[in-house]
Amino acid sequence: MNALDIINLSKSFGAQTALDSINLSVPTGSRTVIVGPSGSGKTTLLRMIAGFEFPDAGSLMLNGQTLVDRTHAVPAYQRQIGYVPQDGALFPHMTVADNIGFGLAETGSARAERIQALMDNVALNADMATRWPHELSGGQQQRVSLARALAQRPRLMLLDEPFSALDTGLRGAMRKMVARLLEEAGVTTILVTHDQGEALSFADQLAVMRDGRLVQSGHPMDLYRYPNDEQTAHFLGDAVVMPARIEAGWAHCDLGRVMVNSNGFAGAAQIMLRPEQLQLSDIPADPDGCHAVVTDRDFGGNVCTLTVELRTQASPGRSLLVRSSGMHAPPAGSAVQLSILGAAHVFATP
């Protein structure tokens, strides 16, 4: 069952098309991430769902109830949708407790107990209840904002790049905490971000937007491994893309003979490999295969990103990105042999 159905949703601002016939279903209890570059339309779509903007065409349905269509629109405050903005947007003149309790129907001891339970859920100490927003760290402010949104028992939670202002180390921990909390609460969630790593990590369902259009959606692992086009491939992570001729399930390319994931296609095509699919080894005494030289090593601790230059007759001098364990990454100048882990992805022909 779907919690949210987005049907042919379109929106323009003057001559600029912000959303172009968006169709997307969000399963109940899932975490859907809408990812795309700046100007792709992802924030406009989130604002449509929240009720802050209204579409020119199309409709939205939440748990079978129409939120907006050509004839009417449910006001934002009646949609039972929680919203956590990028900066938390706490009320500066209210304490933590009053921010969380804003709008609660409960009064007296019931209200205090509800606020304390919400603080416990987001790992805020009881002594923070009387603090002011300016006395909190960025991570603490986001926890308060999340607790305030959960206080209304929303049917859907919207997260608008809530981790982008946090330090790198805190960002990952906060993301995991939020994912766990929302899953335990059974709240369907939509996160908007431009951070590819965050999107892949958080999502059950990933939706990629570009120029106001939804270009691909599905499980994040499927989109990473089998993107629809080269632009999507590069947006979701580093990619090695090259021309090839496909015959009987194999690609003949600059790397030699490479297995592909499309047995039904033959002819000229573009293939894609992720850098982690390229494996390096020492050249054997009787060399045979695809050889290269390491020209650059970017040490990243547990993982190194290497640039290697091919030494093949077909494409001498071509540079490729390779990922290797930081423990065994060869230094610049090393002669290596390349092998392929798994199959290359063949882009669909236009």
Curated annotation (Swiss-Prot):
The organism's superkingdom is given as Bacteria
Question: Do you know which Gene3D superfamilies this protein is assigned to?
Answer: 2.40.50.450, P-loop containing nucleotide triphosphate hydrolases
Q: Give the ABC transporter domain ranges.
A: 4-236
Instruction: Name the gene.
Output: fbpC
The protein, known as:
Fe(3+) ions import ATP-binding protein FbpC
Q: Where in the cell is it found?
A: Cell inner membrane
Describe the family membership recorded for this protein in Swiss-Prot or TrEMBL. Answer: Belongs to the ABC transporter superfamily. Fe(3+) ion importer (TC 3.A.1.10) family.
Coiled-coil positions are none
Which catalytic reaction applies to this protein?
Fe(3+)(out) + ATP + H2O = Fe(3+)(in) + ADP + phosphate + H(+)
Q: What is its EC number?
A: 7.2.2.7
Cellular component aspect of the GO annotation: ATP-binding cassette (ABC) transporter complex
Binding positions for ATP? G36, P37, S38, G39, S40, G41, K42, T43
- Source organism per entry reads Pseudomonas fluorescens (strain Pf0-1)
Q: What is the membrane topology here?
A: Peripheral membrane protein
What GO molecular functions are on record for this protein? Answer: ABC-type ferric iron transporter activity; ATP binding; ATP hydrolysis activity
Q: How would you summarize the oligomeric state and partners of this protein?
A: The complex is composed of two ATP-binding proteins (FbpC), two transmembrane proteins (FbpB) and a solute-binding protein (FbpA).
Instruction: Identify the PROSITE patterns for this entry.
Output: ABC_TRANSPORTER_1, ABC_TRANSPORTER_2, FBPC
Q: Keywords of this protein's UniProt record, alphabetized?
A: ATP-binding, Cell inner membrane, Cell membrane, Ion transport, Iron, Iron transport, Membrane, Nucleotide-binding, Translocase, Transport
UniProt function note: Part of the ABC transporter complex FbpABC involved in Fe(3+) ions import. Responsible for energy coupling to the transport system.
